[in-house]
């Protein structure tokens, strides 16, 4: 290109690559006798990203962990739920093996292994999905089924889920197509009765219908980054058949549906098996016997259930399991708060009786593992507020009375004679 820059002031500068003037672009970057505009920089970045995409699949082919390795990794972060972890490990392994080898093997078409997690609040459904995504280093996004509506109604369109997934990987379509989507509260979109209604159920059966193609596999058209700012740009085409969908819900009352089916099978009249109250199965035992017909009676449509072939049930966490969750996983709650206090140069000790009290409180609230953090946060709030302004504190001790609200944490100072409770 000829030199379009002139020495006199007020003369235009031009991009050395596309020839646009400084008034036609937002930014013109100067180098030794050359200039490049922001549009050409963006184009260069796109070219580099495309090159990286072509190399990435070859790296990924050797990175798929075995079901045993997936299960072991889940054990590091999730307490209990052994059967659910095994089911998830196999389903996830099969899904990514299918992606690596194409949708067919020796002429046999391989179906998607989308997953349905059934279990009470705070049992670890979301944590399992998040942990899997971290292990596999794939994009992960969550959606709340209760906010979804059919296209054309007020609410969140189901295809917004794919947009969120794209945002997590900087709109890299290839990465998004290897991602995991977790849809929570899926039980809340059950239809209101067993019989289809002539009236529209835009937040129930209608959403199930809208999710069908997305979960099974379709090419979703998603606005590019910037969306409405650049209407002339073509929509991104995302193949959802390669995305793993995990749906989760508490399904309150499903155990009763299963119990009715199981008990009906025991017979009536003189030949009936009479069961004592003590023989009744627990909620967890009943959920483990779930069949597609139970989910249909609960309010999920048959087509939707068919798109979620892998079903894993999670048990309500016991008090012992909650205590384990507090101290054993790699990112256990007590370890997180101890790390926070260490940043202040202070040790934090949770006595065993304190852990028992935290677990008991969570059990009473029926919040499962999800409620543990709020209990610990409330117990430590005043201490975390005062500690940065205090001097010579070496250790903070939490016992049962602190969790119960009867006393303040014990503060241990550097000088033995200065030991005192912060509440004194």
Swiss-Prot record:
Zn(2+) binds at residues 15, 18, 37, 40. InterPro entries: AAA+_ATPase, ATP-dep_Clp_protease_ClpX, ATPase_AAA_core, Clp_ATPase_C, Clp_protease_ATP-bd_su_ClpX, ClpX_bact, P-loop_NTPase, Znf_CppX_C4. It comes from the Bacteria. One of its GO terms (molecular function) is ATP-dependent protein folding chaperone. Keywords: ATP-binding, Chaperone, Metal-binding, Nucleotide-binding, Zinc. ATP binds at residues 120-127. The keyword Nucleotide-binding applies. ATP-dependent specificity component of the Clp protease. It directs the protease to specific substrates. Can perform chaperone functions in the absence of ClpP. Component of the ClpX-ClpP complex. Forms a hexameric ring that, in the presence of ATP, binds to fourteen ClpP subunits assembled into a disk-like structure with a central cavity, resembling the structure of eukaryotic proteasomes. This is ATP-dependent Clp protease ATP-binding subunit ClpX. It comes from Citrobacter koseri (strain ATCC BAA-895 / CDC 4225-83 / SGSC4696).
